[in-house]
Each structure stands twice: as structure tokens, then as C-alpha cells.
Regions:
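Short, positively charged and aromatic/hydrophobic N-terminal segments
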Residues: 1-6, 10, 14-16
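Helicase motor core with emphasis on the C-terminal RecA-like subdomain
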Residues: 19-27, 31-35, 39-51, 55-61, ...
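Conserved catalytic helix of short-chain dehydrogenase/reductases
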Residues: 83
Length: 262
């Protein structure tokens, strides 16, 4: 009996792993996961809370988008900026994934249609601002089947973070109202104090913290000193000529300086 049980668990694990990779390929076009992604996804599919610290462009979104596709119900994603929501939703829809963003930039008819789609279970991911989530918690969320909560830019919840948003502090009510729904908090910037504050304020239950490497081998920092004002412009021009077919950004100390350099 013990051997049979182990074999069943092994088969279930392999089947889930196969399903995850098939979903990754068919919806997102990738053949393999980036470091930590697969582990985070398994953790979330097991209905466990987590805090994910990954650099920008490190693949945070797939950590909750893929579990949303493999779970019953709708994933609710809290995002602070309408522009970020729109970008995510457009990308998901282009990949054939039912997603929408409930926010103040929509007209009321569009928001009403989104609410209906959520209640009827036709959306896999709903993006929403913290302010809108608070307003909808006793109405829309109550009538939805929710697979998971993803709190993007989670450092906004902490006064120790660099981008504190008071509305984020009310996200702690999610576990109180929906104790069975797992929460994944994601950020690209949080020191130890901020991470502890995120976990405390969101009331995460025995969360696992995943910290990805922030090493960017394709990025280097080179400081050149000793230029006079006129020499700086000449040095910039020479640098641009050496990298004529490449992309780049020139940062200046003021708007006037930006116009002069341009």
C-alpha cells in the first residue's frame, strides 16, 4: 500500500510538471522555466503563500499567470498603475488568455461587463487597483470564485519601502475574508525589513520567501572622471559614434542640460 501511494504521488508530480511545461510553451512560448519560476509555481498551486523578490524582467508575472491558467476560478492581481495593467492584459489577450482590468479609465459599461465575466467565471485573470479592490471587496469579490491573489509591487505596502501607498495597507483584509485563497506577493525591490513588513501586513500564512539573483552579467558600470564641461559633450558624442547601431539612454542633471545634449 505504501509503495502504491508513493507511485501515485510520483505520477501526480510528473503529470503536474508536464502540464506546467506544456502551458508555458503553448501560452507563453518558452521551452523552459527561468530560475525559481517552477518552484514558485508549484508552491502556489499547492495553495501556499509566498513572497517573491525578482529583478525587473526576471519573469515574476509568469509565477502567478501560469498557476491561474491551471486553477479553477479567477486570479485577482492587484497592480498600482493602470498603464501596467493595460500592458499585462494586452499581452495576455494576445496569447489567447481571458484577462481584463477593472479600473477608473474604463467606462461603466466596460466595467459592468468585466464584473459579469468574473462572476460567471469567464476570466482567468482580473487586474485591479488597490483602491478598486477595496471598493469591490464586499460585492464583486464575494460573488467570484477566486483561485489566488497576486499582489504586484508589494513593497508599496510598507512604509519602509521607497514607494509607499496607503491603500496597499488594507490588503491585509484579503486573508481575513478569503482564508482559503493563497496569496503571492511580488516585488523587485525590498530589503529585509521591508520583506518582513510585507509578510506581516498581508497576514501571509507560513509563507516561503523566494529571492532570485539580481546579477545582470550583460550590464556593466563604468565611471569616467576628470572631464571639463565642454569635454563631456565631446566624450558623449564620441561614445555615440562608437555605438551607432545600438540603443542607449543618456541621463542629465536638468531639463536644460538634456536639451543641450540632445
Amino acid at each position: 500500500m505504501i509503495k502504491i501511494a508513493k507511485e501515485k504521488r510520483t505520477f501526480a508530480t510528473k503529470f503536474k510538471q508536464m502540464l506546467m511545461k506544456e502551458t508555458l510553451k503553448s501560452y507563453f512560448g518558452y521551452d523552459s522555466f527561468r530560475p525559481l519560476q517552477e518552484e514558485i509555481i508549484r508552491h502556489l498551486l499547492n495553495k501556499q503563500d509566498s513572497l517573491v523578490l525578482m529583478p525587473t524582467g526576471g519573469g515574476k508575472s509568469i509565477c502567478y499567470q501560469l498557476p491561474a491558467l491551471l486553477s479553477e476560478g479567477t486570479a485577482v492581481v492587484v497592480s498600482p498603475l493602470i498603464s501596467l495593467m493595460k500592458d499585462q492584459v494586452e499581452t495576455l489577450q494576445a496569447n489567447g488568455i481571458a484577462a481584463g482590468a477593472l479600473n477608473s479609465s474604463n467606462d461603466e459599461t466596460e466595467n459592468a461587463n468585466l464584473r459579469r465575466a468574473c462572476i460567471e467565471g469567464r476570466l482567468k485573470l482580473l487586474y485591479i487597483s488597490p483602491e478598486k479592490l477595496i471598493a469591490e471587496k464586499d460585492y464583486l469579490l464575494r460573488d467570484m470564485s477566486i483561485s489566488l491573489f497576486a499582489i504586484d509591487e508589494a513593497h508599496c505596502i510598507s512604509q519602509w519601502g521607497h514607494d509607499f501607498r496607503p491603500e496597499y495597507t488594507q490588503m491585509g483584509m484579503l486573508h481575513q475574508q478569503f482564508p482559503q485563497v493563497p496569496i503571492i506577493a511580488l516585488t523587485a525591490t525590498a530589503d529585509k525589513i521591508t520583506r518582513e513588513d510585507i509578510i506581516r501586513q498581508l497576514h501571509l500564512i507560513q509563507p516561503r520567501t523566494f529571492i532570485s539573483s539580481f546579477d545582470r552579467p550583460n550590464i556593466s558600470l563604468d565611471v569616467k572622471r576628470g572631464f571639463q564641461a565642454k569635454e563631456k559633450n565631446k566624450a558623449i558624442l564620441e561614445f555615440i559614434h562608437r555605438h551607432r547601431e545600438e540603443s542607449g539612454i543618456i541621463y542629465c542633471m536638468s531639463r536644460n542640460k538634456t536639451e543641450t545634449v540632445a
